Amino acid sequence: MARLKEIYKKEIAPKLLKDLELKNPMEIPRITKITLNMGVGEALADKKVLENAVSDLEKIAGQKAVVTRARKSIAGFKVREGWPIGCKVTLRSDRMYEFLDRLISISIPRIRDFRGISPKQFDGRGNFSMGVSEQIIFPEIDYDKIDKLRGLDICISTTARNNDEGRALLKAFNFPFKG
């Protein structure tokens, strides 16, 4: 079992039950999935760029990435429906907790000029999204072997009912919020 999963079950869940004044243990907020998304607009001109992005995302997640395709044509961006424009990975269960552990303890501290994550990045329903401007903050990526610095989106989906519950959950996991 992943280290953070054990910590959640033994320490975080009972603490949240008491702090949020919940009556039923099934109401305790938990993380359901983590989605990593990398939009690769340059893939329209060069297919090799998308292959490199997919391999980077697979190294970061430890799981196979899925190529995302354009849902509709947009003439302004010179995109046709069905063209590959990015890649994504959805992590659940043990892999999700292992990724979250690496993100909190290793990757986030490696962000340049890092002063804490803004607590305003919640969506109103307890889900948290953040952008990472460089994939080299992850230890799995070798700086000498990448072709270009690319950013990615990290979305953490929770069962929290509002932003306060979601923030309390992530703060219990030692997420480095500002203030």
UniProtKB/Swiss-Prot annotation:
It comes from the Bacteria. The keyword Signal does not apply. The gene is rplE. Keywords: Ribonucleoprotein, Ribosomal protein, RNA-binding, rRNA-binding, tRNA-binding. Part of the 50S ribosomal subunit; part of the 5S rRNA/L5/L18/L25 subcomplex. Contacts the 5S rRNA and the P site tRNA. Forms a bridge to the 30S subunit in the 70S ribosome. This is one of the proteins that bind and probably mediate the attachment of the 5S RNA into the large ribosomal subunit, where it forms part of the central protuberance. In the 70S ribosome it contacts protein S13 of the 30S subunit (bridge B1b), connecting the 2 subunits; this bridge is implicated in subunit movement. Contacts the P site tRNA; the 5S rRNA and some of its associated proteins might help stabilize positioning of ribosome-bound tRNAs. GO terms for molecular function: rRNA binding; structural constituent of ribosome; tRNA binding. One of its GO terms (cellular component) is ribonucleoprotein complex. Pfam families: Ribosomal_L5 (PF00281), Ribosomal_L5_C (PF00673). Belongs to the universal ribosomal protein uL5 family. This is Large ribosomal subunit protein uL5. GO terms for biological process: translation.
